[in-house]
């Protein structure tokens, strides 16, 4: 199957009337905001999109995206590979006042001044939202063992260190 680059913007109304489906990719170097959020972008973003008109006569853009990235483990500070996958369903609106009228199953997305939506920006937003809050290896692959981790009780050597704010207490007494 041939790899096809996806357009940067689309006209969702025309695409929905034609019931268009897109299967393609965005190159890793096009996803600048995602690249700033991860250690490394390892693959192109594989994207599948479908445009259609639902029974309520609403234009709908439904899609899936998948990409491989390197994230920094917050336990051992070593990079590890993570596959980000997400699905989304949008319905374009002319302004945010119309967003309140949409069914809850659809996320609103606003048209630009040309009646198009920023497709690459939307896909990149979804990938950024799919990033884990605290990236970590699975415990069997992490270099930091459970014995080295502190869970609520300080080790004695840390508890015996002098409080750096004790100097402030002396100033308060003067």
From Swiss-Prot:
InterPro entries in the cross-refs: YceD, YceD_bac
BP term (GO), one: ribosome biogenesis
GO cellular component: cytosol
UniProt keywords, alphabetically: Ribosome biogenesis
UniProt keyword Transmembrane present: no
Keyword Zinc included in the entry's annotation: no
Family: Belongs to the DUF177 domain family.
PANTHER family cross-referenced by the UniProt entry: LARGE RIBOSOMAL RNA SUBUNIT ACCUMULATION PROTEIN YCED
Function as written in the Swiss-Prot or TrEMBL entry: Plays a role in synthesis, processing and/or stability of 23S rRNA.
Name this protein carries in UniProt: Large ribosomal RNA subunit accumulation protein YceD
